[in-house]
Structure formats: C-alpha cells, structure tokens
Amino acid sequence: MSLDLALDVQYATTSDYLPSEEQLALWVKTAIGNSMKQAELTIRIVDARESQMLNGTYRGKDKPTNVLSFPFEAPPEIELPLLGDLVICASVVENEAREQDKTLEAHWAHMVVHGCLHLLGYDHIEDEEAEEMESLETQLIESLGFTDPYKEQ
C-alpha cells in the first residue's frame, strides 16, 4: 500500500544543509509506513530562538530542542488524515550530528522519523516504551540506508 502524503514544508531558517522536500517526504513515508492510507503533515524548520520559545511554551523547558511533535487530535467520531506538525530546529540537529559524529542527512532522517513516531502515538517516557520506539526507529533508519542512530550512545 502506498501512502498518499500531503506534506507542507516551511523553511523558517537558513543553514548550510537543510533537507529537500523530497528527502523529508521519503523519511515521513518510511516512518508512517502502512499505519495510514492518507496523511497530512506540516514540517517547520526553525532557528534556535523559535524552538526555545515553543519548547518553553509547550514543554516548560527554556532551551531549544531538536524536534517537537504536535499531534492533531480530532474527536473520535471524525476521521481525518491530519497527522499533526513537526517543528525541527536546524542548529540543534547540526550540533547533535557533529557531537554524535553522524552525517547531517542521517541525523535529519532520524529526527523526522522520531517525530513522526511521536505523532503516531509512540513515546519514550517509560523504559519499555522507549525500547519499543528505539527499536522501531533503528529498523526504519536502517531501511533508509543509515546506521543505527542509538549505536554508541
């Protein structure tokens, strides 16, 4: 089954490397897999200031973060393909990639997959949930040709 994806990409910052809409769509489709027939999703790529503001407002943490996931929650009787929004901070992703000795492309792919899994309801608060989510992330990232994102962490 092929996913019918409506992806809105908003580039609200500049950087030496930002993934293309085609790359982002591939990573989203890989993460969503057969979970949905149709999906609508917005990915907003932001600077540290906007990330810090959103992270403070929605998570109570006064610092920028790599990815924020905002799932769309419709009433149960209404079926819509709206998955939600991802907000990804380019500078945090770049710094983490450098610190973890990963390519930018590999870390961007990981952040998109990670964020999409949150939108699908996965979480990593409890150890058991974290193991399940990390295992799935690893499978998906490796299917894209990248190495295990949690190796050596």
Curated annotation (Swiss-Prot):
EC numbers, comma separated: 3.1.-.-
Sorted UniProt keywords: Cytoplasm, Endonuclease, Hydrolase, Metal-binding, Nuclease, Ribosome biogenesis, rRNA processing, Zinc
Cofactor note: Binds 1 zinc ion.
Amino acids binding Zn(2+): 114, 118, 124
Cofactor: Zn(2+)
GO molecular function: metalloendopeptidase activity; RNA endonuclease activity; zinc ion binding
Name this polypeptide is given: Endoribonuclease YbeY
Species this protein is from: Shewanella oneidensis (strain ATCC 700550 / JCM 31522 / CIP 106686 / LMG 19005 / NCIMB 14063 / MR-1)
Gene this protein is translated from: ybeY
